[in-house]
């Protein structure tokens, strides 16, 4: 049995990545592709690399075009999902790759996004640890009909730090994360600061001082993992790589814990995870190791002189950071094998 699929916003980077992954999924069948500005165009004109869809045509993004499918993936700008979703059947599985339904706290939404607050949906990070109820988020995704996919930066920081927060081996009040990110995370819209002539041979920090919209979501996740207040300083740095995130996150080592205790916390958290892997001691990931895959690689160290735990996490922002997470969560919701249709291995060189 196959499930019929519509992808809204299929002309963008996230939408295109959804199509690439879904092309090899044995149980999810793409029937409808929607777009805004590209409606009426052939897919080959927008995504020439997706030859299996070359002759398909984008249609307008309306609730009418999306209705009647078993699964709808939304790859739309924030603020665009709520109105469309309200018109879709409650029994349709809707997976939103945008920010509209990630935050639980309405005040945080108002402060960082603004506009109408659409409310939180079940959160699409299966590996997210839960301190109070125990277990992981995957048990809370089974059978749901609405899923909010995490932000890509949020995923990288959460996967890097949550085992330590959960085990209490790091101080939650002193978390610092600096992320090297590629421009594809900002979408496909033309912007001067994302032009090749602006970013090649350079690097630039942005949203400095806790102003990035992913900040409250990072805090929300780490507080879910630890059960208490978390203070996090997050700074992204735009670097000249098309895709990928390398997240270097540090936190103060909690009193009374050893290097062995720290490593044991990460080993316990990820021992059975299909897509998150703790690297051997002294080994740290490159972004190229995970390109094209739904895998997250985590390196771990202790800065003895500074008394801090350091994690380095690499993900592909378009796969594990967006489209792969969407499909992984949809698989769970539909009762399919979690890893079905998702690449584990990266592409090299």
From Swiss-Prot:
<dbReference type="GO" id="GO:0003942">
    <property type="term" value="F:N-acetyl-gamma-glutamyl-phosphate reductase activity"/>
</dbReference>
<dbReference type="InterPro" id="IPR000534">
    <property type="entry name" value="Semialdehyde_DH_NAD-bd"/>
</dbReference>
<keyword id="KW-0521">NADP</keyword>
<dbReference type="Pfam" id="PF01118">
    <property type="entry name" value="Semialdhyde_dh"/>
</dbReference>
<dbReference type="GO" id="GO:0006526">
    <property type="term" value="P:L-arginine biosynthetic process"/>
</dbReference>
<keyword id="KW-0028">Amino-acid biosynthesis</keyword>
<dbReference type="GO" id="GO:0005737">
    <property type="term" value="C:cytoplasm"/>
</dbReference>
<comment type="pathway">
    <text>Amino-acid biosynthesis; L-arginine biosynthesis; N(2)-acetyl-L-ornithine from L-glutamate: step 3/4.</text>
</comment>
<dbReference type="InterPro" id="IPR050085">
    <property type="entry name" value="NAGSA_dehydrogenase"/>
</dbReference>
<keyword id="KW-0055">Arginine biosynthesis</keyword>
<keyword id="KW-0560">Oxidoreductase</keyword>
<feature type="active site">
    <location>
        <position position="152"/>
    </location>
</feature>
<dbReference type="Pfam" id="PF22698">
    <property type="entry name" value="Semialdhyde_dhC_1"/>
</dbReference>
<dbReference type="InterPro" id="IPR023013">
    <property type="entry name" value="AGPR_AS"/>
</dbReference>
<comment type="similarity">
    <text>Belongs to the NAGSA dehydrogenase family. Type 1 subfamily.</text>
</comment>
<dbReference type="InterPro" id="IPR000706">
    <property type="entry name" value="AGPR_type-1"/>
</dbReference>
<keyword id="KW-0963">Cytoplasm</keyword>
<dbReference type="GO" id="GO:0070401">
    <property type="term" value="F:NADP+ binding"/>
</dbReference>
<protein>
    <recommendedName>
        <fullName>N-acetyl-gamma-glutamyl-phosphate reductase</fullName>
        <ecNumber>1.2.1.38</ecNumber>
    </recommendedName>
</protein>
<comment type="function">
    <text>Catalyzes the NADPH-dependent reduction of N-acetyl-5-glutamyl phosphate to yield N-acetyl-L-glutamate 5-semialdehyde.</text>
</comment>
<dbReference type="InterPro" id="IPR036291">
    <property type="entry name" value="NAD(P)-bd_dom_sf"/>
</dbReference>
<dbReference type="GO" id="GO:0051287">
    <property type="term" value="F:NAD binding"/>
</dbReference>
